Amino acid sequence: MFKLTHVWAIAAICLSSVQTIDAQHYDSFKIHSHNDYEQKSPFWNAYANGLTSIEVDVFLKDKTLYATHAESEIIPNNTIRSLYLDPLSREVKAGKITDDIQLLIDLKSEAESTLKEIVNVLKKYPELTSSPNIRFVISGNRPAPENYNNYPEYIMFDWQDPDHRPGSNWDKVALVSVNFADYSVWNGLGRLTAEDKKSVVSVIEKAHSTGKPFRFWGAPDTKSAWKAFTELGVDYINTDQPAASSAYLRSLKERTFTNNGYSTPYIPDFEHDGKDQEIRNVILLIGDGFGLTQLSAAVFANNNTATITQLKSIGLMKTQSADDFTTDSAAAGTALATGEKTNNRAIGTGTEGQPLENITEFLDKHGFVSGIITTDRITGATPSAFYAHQKERSESARIARDLLRSKISLLIGGGKNDFEAVVKQSGFTVADQVKDITASTGEKVCWFMAPNEVPSVLKGRKNDLAQATGYGLEYLDNKQKPFFLMIEGAQIDWGGHANNTGMIITEAIDFDKAVTEAIRFADTHKNTLVIITADHETSGFSIPQGNIHTSFIEGSFTTHDHTGVMVPVFAYGPHSGTFTGVYENTEIFHKIITLLGFNEK
């Protein structure tokens, strides 16, 4: 059962919590189910979806109150009692209605006789009329305003003339409703024109100046309209789509975000970008779940800029796994790390379960040192694909034990409580602070970002990823050997799974800070190639609205899972143009090996 709060409905039953949207300081909103009796499940559809108002048209015939717009449309069993009063009565008797509810009844037959019969019928429902949480609002054909006080206290009225008040009977008015078409021709797509917005805002403010809630009827019924009316302070959002409008408005808090943590973009010098010269170091940055829209949202929320978007060599990568159209991170990470497609859930193993040589193992034979940095646990699917060989990604203990024979010299991520022992057993020195990495004299060094799961930026993680990238590059460079470094911004994906726009944006901006460190390093180490991509896209993310000037983004989602869309690839440094075009995720491995001048396995 949905929690119910302050709901005064329109020809409707208002049942649901007053919902507030923190993003952009949205006011509380209520949703009105227009002509609810025409729904496949009158009352129940709106009630189950937590709507705050349910409209029922009523026509009196032969002492029966039919739920209908006109006498010619009467359906014998569809009465106000069967469709609305009886269900509401059952909910009250069951103790499920504890907050304010309003039933607004739109009279389609003659006002006074119809209202008289409504009062007679309501006498049979004392549990409703005596409830401090329930009152009834009369709309449509109404008696003269001077007669409002002749009706019981629980009977209120809908007022439709914002320019005048009914004198001493104003306390019997529950809300103000007007026809949207009298103020605008907007169809709910795009946005209101400046002139129309001025007219719309004027009538809303006029109604609010009386202390009454406000509703438009005949209003556009789209997502853009629902959001616009919420922002403008319309108290009841009019809809013929109870489920869709409720889902949209209820999720606005998680789908909208105003950024206040920025990344200063680094402008590359491009001196060695695209040049035909030797590559000594390779930095591969993987934004988990980092599709083009995730990147766009981060850019728009970051003063319309990012280090990533300074780059000139851009490609698109396909992400399908061997056994599924939509990959998981294990199969995607394996494809990037080994150049081979595999089944979902497999870590560094082929479709038959056989171990696949990964890039860190391959390069070790050619004198390279390698490192892994992630904001996931060190056994996360993407990072482990670069050192482990297990058929099942959930086998964290076995994955960690693969560190014993790995070719990794630098390891940074979460999970200290679970994995510190095996890390030390694998020959790693564990640094207390990230800055201690560069002073380490050990052959292998590890720093744990967190005892368990690495916290998100929204939950307090600071500049750990960028700092780890900077110190990690310094550590590898000090070894005086060519190196390969994989850096993962893992929690962009987590924001997608949670359908949380703010988490996507903050994690993507944080990832861009790591990109800045990599590009800056490449500018001072001319033989360094930087590649930035994703393992897959997460959530089917889109951006229906936003404001670049205020760093505000509204996101929308088609799923809580991964999708099969192509993801962007950016490259910087010698031979960066090799990464333009459209290709499979396995090609990242092959392109790197070829550019380094090695024959493959």
Where do the language-model regions lie?
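N-terminal catalytic scaffold of extracellular/periplasmic and nuclease hydrolases
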Residues: 256-415, 420-431, 537, 541-601
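Structural recognition of the beta-strand scaffold that forms the well-ordered cores
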Residues: 30-33, 54-56, 66, 102-107, ...
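Loop/turn elements at helix/coil->beta-strand transitions in domains of secreted/extracellular proteins
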Residues: 26-29, 50, 98-102, 130-135, ...
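Active-site regions of oxyanion-processing enzymes, predominantly non-cytosolic
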Residues: 433, 437-448, 468-490
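Phosphate-group recognition and catalysis centered on beta-loop-alpha active-site segments
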Residues: 23-271, 278, 295
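Bacterial Sec-dependent N-terminal signal peptides
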Residues: 1-26
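Active-site His/acidic residue clusters
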Residues: 381-387, 453-454, 472, 477-482, ...
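Metal-dependent active-site segment of extracytoplasmic phospho-/sulfohydrolases and closely related
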Residues: 292, 510-550
